[in-house]
Amino acid sequence: MKLSEMQKYKELVSAHKRSEISNEELQKTFITDGAILSNLYQEMEMDSDSVDCHDDVNYTKDSIQLHSHTFYEMLYCRSGNVQYLLGAERYRVRRGDIIFIPPGISHRPLYLDQLAEPYSRYVIWIHPEFMKNIQQFLGFIPLSDPVLLRTQDSGWEYMER
């Protein structure tokens, strides 16, 4: 399922219920409506052959299952304090952090505590062929391992303002 299709479906269901629904509720609705999605995030496809961008917010401890993608994913944490499983490593992610996830790397957020504030993030998906072009332009950048970049207390903090 493409991201745009999922967002349209989510808008329709939210309008019908007259309130925003969580991703977990959306997955239950898919199952109820006869769609078979074992893992909503694993099934996602890019709309573009270059870059897709969207923002995502979790207000509850949605059960996002371990999943991977066929494209690169970058997450910029706008709010929230969660742990993130990247491959076999676990990281504490907080406001201002950037996560870079190569294709095929299993990942998921871990909601170990009650969410005191929503887990809000900007998400950028980058098609592998487009990333290859970027690498040719910028020179060699090792992109086979996940990366967590902290921006708090650095010159990169201006991105949030």
Annotate each PLM feature.
Residues 50-143:
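N-terminal regulatory/effector-sensing and dimerization cores
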